[in-house]
Amino acid sequence: MDINELKQFQIFNKLDENEVKKFQKKMKNINVPEGQNFIVEGDIGDSIYLLLEGQIRINQALTLSMHTGGLDNREKAIINLSANVKPLFGEMSLFDKDDRRNASVKAITECELAQLMSDDLLAICDEFPDIGYKVMKNLAKILCKRLVETNQNVLKLTTAFSLVLER
């Protein structure tokens, strides 16, 4: 993985090349074949991923109760992401060791990922507080943006549900 490519990811915004290299040294390259789920909803997470090449689909289980007493195992595609937008995912595992993945991630095409273990990322942030501050600020921006998007989606769903109930 190229250092200039890594610098394009929002998590490394405002970090210089030497600062990003500290993370690069701890990253593992992973190749995922087309069609493979490589994060499974409900599993315990211990790493974050950067999508270097390919396309992924993030899914969540609907898990609706059926009249027969069983579960509906269908999944809802939340978003498709391409490497050209430099996505990062799995970041919630940084903040809670027992945090379970809240979605599944599937490779739509063959993918190349950079995996960074949560413990390694946090150790770098502890050892180099200036770098840690920048990375955590960047993560906060990422999470805030996602929270705003989630709130907008909840409002849309609530509005649609209210309109259906009014009929």
List the predicted regions and their residue ranges.
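Short, flexible helix/strand-to-coil boundary loops that buttress conserved ligand/catalytic motifs
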Residues: 60-62, 93, 117, 125-128
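Cyclic nucleotide-binding regulatory domains
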Residues: 37-108
